[in-house]
Amino acid sequence: MPASSGQQASAIEAKGFPNLPRVHWTERYFRLVWGAVGIVGCLLLWQLGSSTGVFDPLFVSSPLEVLRTAVLLLPSPEFLGHLFITSQCLFLGLSIALVVGVLVGLPIGWFPRLNATFEPVIAAVYGVPYIAFLPVIIMWTGIGMTSRVIIVFWSALFPLIINSIQGARGVDDNFLRVGRSFSATNFQMFLTITLPSSVPYILAGLRTSIGRAIVGVVVAEFFMSSKGLGYFINLKANALEMAPAFVAIVLLALFGIALVSLVTYIENRFCNW
């Protein structure tokens, strides 16, 4: 199946990963330190822009103001309720997308006829912005938890399908020949060779899906909810209460960092064969 440039980028990233040596603790420390330097640098520039008047305080709160607001908001039961609703939608939708994406993508990549049949369907649907399905989902399921989870699921699904397909197609032929030499059935080779070899591809797709899922949950809560961080951001921004809105935005960013870091840890821990 011909791959788009985005598919190739994810596939190349995953394909090269199994041959990398285990990351040394010194290198991990190096990345951690410079990552922290980058974050602190951005915060300092943000604070400098706020202090010098480059950023209008009516529209952009300073980091110190956001921090002070966070100290007041985080213990609030109302705000914690918004946080819980968003976390619930995000993790439910992302988990379902991971399971469905792998179960759909691996067989399509493994069987050439399925690949040829579903390639144009996947290309067509993936080319449509997932936000375009929002009115349709509202009509089908109404406004509630189910519709929001579906939006998150749909937002995260296709990178996982595409990378699972690439993983199944990228199995080393030498491994398959060894399996056949031991008279392994197609199903046995799928379970013992294709599935483990596809894990780096799947994790690469999961990293992409995390960002898309966060966007999906925020957009869903903008239009389809009276709870959640997306609703909270929309409510506070419309009232020009920017500091609380930025607290919620920072929390969403921390969600993304934490989930991507978890995926990276899993790669470093289990995919160094």
Feature-to-residue mapping (PLM):
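Transmembrane alpha-helices
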Residues: 150, 154, 186-220, 246-247, ...
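Transmembrane-helix boundary motif in ABC transporter permease subunits
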Residues: 92-122
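Periplasmic/extracellular loop-to-transmembrane helix junction in inner-membrane transport proteins
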Residues: 16-28, 51-96
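Generic hydrophobic transmembrane alpha-helix motif, especially the helices
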Residues: 123-159, 166-167
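Transmembrane alpha-helical segments of polytopic membrane transport and secretion proteins
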Residues: 1-40, 261-273
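Short cytoplasmic-facing helical segments at TM-TM junctions of multi-pass membrane proteins
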Residues: 120, 160-163, 167-205, 229, ...
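Hydrophobic alpha-helical transmembrane segments of polytopic membrane proteins
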Residues: 230-265
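Membrane-spanning helices that line or support transport/gating and their immediate boundary helices
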Residues: 51, 106, 113-120, 163, ...
